Amino acid sequence: MPKTRRQRTRRARRNRPPTPWPISQDLDRASYMDTPSTCLAIVYRPIGVPSQVVYVPPAYIDMPSWPPVQSTNSPGTPSMDALSALLSNTLSLASPPSPPREPQGPSRSLPLPPLLSPPRFHLPSFNQCESTPPTEMDAWNQPSGISSPPSPSPNLASVPKTSTPPGEKP
């Protein structure tokens, strides 16, 4: 079965989608190229008046006139000409420039310490500071296996027994 080409329908220019800006009939644009910079002049005219190009002079940017530059050299300071002459005398092409020397650093045999050390995480320990005496809260928080100062709980030896286990005599 032979392929058939579909005819493309061309959109007429009049059926264009509307532009986002209003198209007005009362606008004439005149461009003047008589200056190095291009000036675009927009001339508005009322509808119905025959179009006539009105010359709009280009807007020249008026450069401000600066006061003459005063000498910035204080007495005793050499001028830039004297400095450049001195520099050109010291840098002559007769002697090639010496290669820059590397600064004397530490010997290469010793390993350099790392610039950044990895973070060190300390596990929480109960003996955080050996030199400081434990506070009252530290005494309560210590596990029972570690010897601790006498706690404020009553001693079992000083409490009178109210009941005796069977088999024992009071």
Curated annotation (Swiss-Prot):
Effect annotated for changing S131A: 70% loss of function, no effect on Rex's phosphorylation and RNA-binding
Q: Does the keyword Phosphoprotein apply?
A: yes
Name the reported effect of S107A: No effect on function
MF terms from GO for this chain are:
RNA binding
Which compartments is it annotated to reside in?
A: Host nucleus, Host nucleolus; Host cytoplasm
Please tell me, according to the UniProt entry, what happens when changing S51A: No effect on function
Please provide the Gene Ontology terms (biological process) for this protein: mRNA transport
Modified residue annotations for Phosphoserine: S151, S153
Q: List keywords of the entry alphabetically.
A: Host cytoplasm, Host nucleus, mRNA transport, Phosphoprotein, RNA-binding, Transport
Name the family: Belongs to the deltaretrovirus Rex protein family.
What is this protein for, i.e. what is its function? Rex escorts unspliced gag-pro-pol and singly spliced env mRNAs out of the nucleus of infected cells. These mRNAs carry a recognition sequence called Rex responsive element (RxRE or XRE) located at the 3' region of the long terminal repeat (LTR). This function is essential since most HTLV proteins are translated from unspliced or partially spliced pre-mRNAs that cannot exit the nucleus by the pathway used by fully processed cellular mRNAs.
Protein name, as recorded: Protein Rex
Question: Which species is the source of this protein?
Answer: Human T-cell leukemia virus 2 (HTLV-2)
Taxonomic classification: Viruses, Riboviria, Pararnavirae, Artverviricota, Revtraviricetes
